């Protein structure tokens, strides 16, 4: 069960104050379908009360791929972005907005067909990273248990061209 109360309240508040031509971009990790099935209806309802002739809401999903630490801002500007709008105008406006922030000459943007695809991509990215961290963490525990140097083992594996990106042990998932 996912409690969307806080998220829904925030979207509702946004909907009470934005103009009918404002673009809303959800940049956080949310379950697939959240942008279209939760945020969109709330925004549409709030905007329709103030703008009865409104036909569609300008809403998109574009998640951040930031690296914490001293280079945080650089990781926003100089990194690839995925985005998707709830409708064509939302996608176009989102792309135009992101172009003002992202270094698109070096870091291309990827437009997906639906926000749920963008939301899924973010969760898959997070899951992929978490699984790899957990994987190497388990091997680290095993190496300690049997008394071997896991860094030496990893170096031996990395000679294979397809395995150069194997992670090294660290603090573990969430650490």
What kind of feature is each model-predicted range?
Residues 1-175:
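Structural/interface elements that position substrates and couple domains in central-metabolism enzymes
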């Amino acid at each position: 069960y996912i409690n969307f109360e806080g998220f829904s309240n925030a979207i509702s508040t946004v909907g009470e104050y934005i103009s009918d031509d404002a673009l809303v971009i959800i940049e956080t990790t949310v379950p697939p379908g959240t942008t279209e099935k939760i945020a969109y209806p709330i925004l549409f309802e709030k905007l329709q009360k103030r703008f009865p002739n409104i036909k569609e809401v300008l809403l998109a999903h574009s998640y951040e791929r930031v690296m914490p630490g001293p280079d945080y801002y650089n990781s926003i500007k100089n990194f690839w972005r995925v985005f998707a709008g709830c409708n064509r105008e939302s996608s176009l406006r989102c792309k135009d907005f992101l172009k003002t922030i992202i270094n698109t000459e070096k870091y291309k943007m990827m437009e997906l067909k639906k926000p749920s695809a963008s939301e899924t991509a973010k969760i898959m990215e997070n899951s992929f990273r978490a699984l790899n961290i957990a994987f190497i963490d388990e091997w680290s525990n095993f190496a300690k248990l049997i008394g071997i140097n896991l860094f030496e083992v990893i170096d031996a594996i990395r000679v294979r061209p397809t395995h150069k990106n194997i992670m090294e042990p660290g603090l573990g998932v969430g650490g």
